[in-house]
């Protein structure tokens, strides 16, 4: 385990809970642990590009992710190692990653693992390991999914991914039926209504399906230059494998199908 260099890089949005969980997990797993705060480096970068640190726009958020990738790449060079990417299939489908930030690595181990499966894997591994590692993984499993790029509110996570882009259980369902089977939008929606009728309203399902198609099309440019990664399931978005799509493809025809009332 000591050959694995695990790095935590706290910045503006890092909560004490997630920081402590990362430190506890590294200790429990026995890996080499490093803490590299990037706040000062990002603030200096803001000065260099004349960005007001109070302007919490895309540059404010993405600069943190790109600074972290810079740190990881250079640590990897020093350690004569490679950067292992943490991004998963759901994030790639939605483009929920910073271009040349967490989007980039030297090998993406989770590239074909959807977020819902990630949750199951964490739960399984927590039970298998038990002890301190199991307790931390259990806590991580019940922590809101967040990139933590915006400052916390009262010490708690302010930026909650599933409130912004939609529930991952829906997006993974949409992705599977749209990509694996090539079903049209109206059929994907029909199946979602049958599968989730006890949990989500028809309007909610339609809303997040529209968002899925909008993001899936507009974010293809990030998938066109992915690091290598392993294919695990039946769906892959690698441009070198199962998925080839022009980055300027238009989602309009798919979205129009969802405007048609049954």
Predicted segments with their positions:
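ATP/NTP-dependent adenylation/nucleotidyl-transfer catalytic domains that generate, transfer
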Residues: 1-262
